[in-house]
Amino acid sequence: MLDIACGSGRHLASFAARQHAVTGVDRDTNQARLHAPSAELLCADIENNPWPLQTDGVLRTFGAVVVTNYLWRPLLETVVNSVAPGGVLLYETFAAGNEALGRPSRPDFLLQPGELLQACAGLQVVAYENGTLQDPPRVVQRIAAIRAPADHRRHPEIWRLAL
């Protein structure tokens, strides 16, 4: 599992508690290290430096990629491409309309209507929402999307569903 902009490491800790291998990327990994000591943590400024999970042009992929409350458009394609065959992307961040409720309010940090759907065009969308949440009030887009398994051509209309 990869958590991009992992912050305090709450998602890393949750997945690690369920015996998943976890990797987190953030510009400051100190809090994540406290909450998810077993995690592979990469301290990296992903907005100003090369993607740390790519070596010699080969992108490392994960069975699950999680992104919450973070948007850096130049990385959207890399985020989606980091989902391994059969893997899932869980992404939630602020969307247009949030500027009326609080921060972030700059358009650079707010998804436009349908932007996550467009970014995930190569994945099978399982769930998508664009709307308002409370406590604290905010406007978000969220998506759960699956990359087809490597053998999907045998049964292209059938997706493995598991919780």
Question: PLM features: residue spans?
Answer:
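A short, conserved alpha-helix within the catalytic core of class I
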Residues: 71-80
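Helix-to-beta-strand junctions that scaffold the AdoMet/dcAdoMet cofactor pocket
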Residues: 83-84
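A short acidic, Gly/Pro-enriched loop at the edge of an enzyme's catalytic core
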Residues: 52-64
